């Protein structure tokens, strides 16, 4: 698979990346499913490995995907290839008891750093290649707090 420069970062990523939301397995909040379905861990491992062997080196996950389980599964499946892959993870939304959609936004500096720390632990790595805000700020004030 062809690789392309990711802007001016020096990172070369595959033309196709793998989104990992559904690969964390089933999770729900207040009975509301937070995933596409119940992808079993062995199936997720096969998908991760097949993607890697097919030339995909960009994997997009998030702290909120299956309540962090997507990050754990990605780490477990590809730990021996960490230097060959690029991990993109996101922060800024988290589970809550809100209705009808049980997610809240927190783009504060403190929350972003603490979320990154938790992601690094779940991913069993010292770094992520790209760290993203899961959604844009709702206001100028929210942007200033980042």
Go through each PLM region and give its residues.
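Glycine/proline-rich, positively charged
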Residues: 31-32, 99-146
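P-loop/Walker A phosphate-binding loop and immediately adjacent motor/lid segment at beta-alpha junctions
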Residues: 82, 94, 144
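N-terminal binding-site loop/beta-alpha segment at the start of enzyme catalytic domains
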Residues: 1-86
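Generic enzyme active-site microenvironment
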Residues: 58-61, 88, 127, 132
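Active-site beta-loop-alpha junctions enriched in small/polar residues
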Residues: 21-23, 62-64, 90-94, 133-136
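Secondary-structure boundary/capping motif
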Residues: 77-79, 91-94, 115, 119, ...
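A short acidic, often aromatic-flanked loop/helix-cap motif at beta-alpha or helix-coil junctions
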Residues: 11, 95-96
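Glycine/Thr-rich phosphate-binding loops of Rossmann-like dinucleotide-binding domains
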Residues: 26, 69, 97, 138-141
């Amino acid at each position: 698979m062809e690789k392309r420069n990711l802007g001016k970062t020096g990172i070369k990523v595959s033309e196709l990346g793998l989104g990992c939301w559904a690969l964390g397995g089933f999770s729900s909040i207040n009975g509301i499913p937070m995933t596409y379905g119940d992808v079993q861990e062995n199936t997720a491992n096969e998908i991760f490995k097949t993607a890697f062997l097919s030339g995909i080196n960009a994997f997009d996950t998030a702290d909120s995907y299956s309540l962090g389980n997507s990050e754990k599964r990605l780490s477990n499946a590809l730990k021996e290839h960490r230097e060959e892959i690029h991990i993109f993870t996101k922060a800024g939304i988290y589970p809550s008891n809100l209705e009808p959609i049980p997610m809240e936004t927190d783009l504060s500096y403190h929350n972003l750093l603490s979320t990154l720390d938790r992601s690094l632990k779940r991913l069993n790595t010292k770094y992520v290649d790209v760290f993203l805000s899961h959604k844009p700020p709702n206001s100028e004030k929210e942007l200033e707090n980042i």
